[in-house]
Every structure is written in C-alpha cells, then in structure tokens.
C-alpha cells in the first residue's frame, strides 16, 4: 500500500519577518533534538547512534582484534579506507585489493578493525556535534533574553540600538552555525552507510 503524499495546509507562502526571527531562534533546533530522543543537545534530525556494532552488518560472531593497529599492513589500510576524505570508490578499491588474496577466515577480523576505526572517528564527530548543539541552545536562550529586553524598551531609549546590534550579531552567528550543522550532521550516518558497503564487499569475496 503506497502512502499518499500529504498536501500542504496552505498554498500561500507565509513570510516570516526579521522581527520574529529572534523569538524563533531558540526553537530552531528543538524538532531535530526531539527526534534523537537520547540526548537533548543532539542537534541533528538523523537518529543518534552512539556506537556501531559489527553484528548489525555481519552475520555470525565477530571477535574484535585489539592489536590490529600493530599490524604494519592492516593499520594503514584500515585508516585509509575509513578516512572520510577517501572517496567511496577509492575506499572500496583499496579494501577489495587487500581482501581478495587473504583467506575468508581472516575477513571477519578485518571487518572488526574497520568497525573499530569507524567508531573512533564517529565518537569524535558525535561529541563535537553535541557540544555544538549545547552552544546553539545557549545562544538561542541568549537571543530570546535580548529580545525580551528590547520588548521592554521604548523606541527612543539609548540602550536600544546597542541591544539590537548585539542581538543581530548573535542571530547571524546562530543561523550560520545551523547551516553548517546541516552538513556536519550527515557525517555519522554516512560513515555507517560506508561500513555497510564494506561489509557487503567482504562477504561477497
């Protein structure tokens, strides 16, 4: 059964004036944080998955090899394959070239190393995103407080111009950070997707 697309409630575009932006700033990240349902500071629409399990991608038992970083051949391969700057096709080519000649019995340990490295990098990314989410929440509260102060001032009050300038600078910084976070939030999910690709490649060998 196919779901019917929801029709927009309003066909007419609703424009939000700049005077309303400060009051909306504190709520901008709340819907995505609510989707995470795990950490209120998680700023992404994507579900928060703190750590990836090898069993989610690989059938059967996989025993992690904690000393894989001491392997002079395996360590540089894993770091290159998992590196976010390595394009997908280059990463799969490197992994395929390494995995083709090795026995099938060694491939689970190879995949476990890929999972370890992925989790290490994702953990750093997730911590940074949560820290950024906390900063955005605090910034939204600051903007809302400045707006409340402005509401209590008369147009001719001397303090008004300074507060408006401060509020607008904070709002601009808030909006720019939100824009950057939309892209940064894709990184943990992209790493999870790539890990699934690597698992399928190794299982086909």
Regions found by a protein language model. Give the residues of each.
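N-terminal secretory signal peptides that target proteins for export/translocation
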Residues: 1-20
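N-terminal Sec/ER secretory leader and immediately downstream segment
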Residues: 37-105
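Short E/K-rich amphipathic alpha-helical oligomerization segments
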Residues: 144-169
């Amino acid at each position: 059964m196919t779901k019917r697309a929801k029709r927009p409630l309003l066909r007419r575009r609703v424009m939000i004036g700049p005077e309303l932006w400060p009051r909306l700033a504190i709520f901008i990240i709340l819907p995505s944080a609510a989707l995470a349902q795990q950490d209120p500071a998680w700023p992404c629409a994507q579900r928060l998955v703190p750590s990836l399990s090898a069993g989610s991608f690989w059938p059967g038992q996989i025993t992690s090899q904690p000393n894989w970083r001491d392997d002079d051949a395996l360590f540089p391969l894993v770091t290159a394959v998992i590196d976010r700057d390595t394009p997908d096709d280059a990463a799969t080519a490197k992994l395929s070239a390494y995995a083709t000649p090795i026995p099938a019995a060694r491939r689970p340990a190879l995949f476990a190393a890929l999972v370890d490295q992925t989790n290490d990098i994702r953990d750093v990314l997730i911590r940074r995103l949560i820290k950024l989410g906390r900063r955005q929440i605090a910034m939204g509260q600051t903007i809302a407080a400045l707006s409340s102060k402005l509401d209590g001032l008369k147009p001719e009050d001397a303090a008004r111009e300074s507060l408006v300038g401060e509020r607008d600078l904070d709002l601009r910084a808030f909006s720019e950070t939100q824009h950057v976070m939309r892209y940064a939030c894709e990184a943990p999910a992209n790493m999870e997707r790539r890990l699934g690709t690597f698992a399928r490649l190794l299982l086909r060998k």
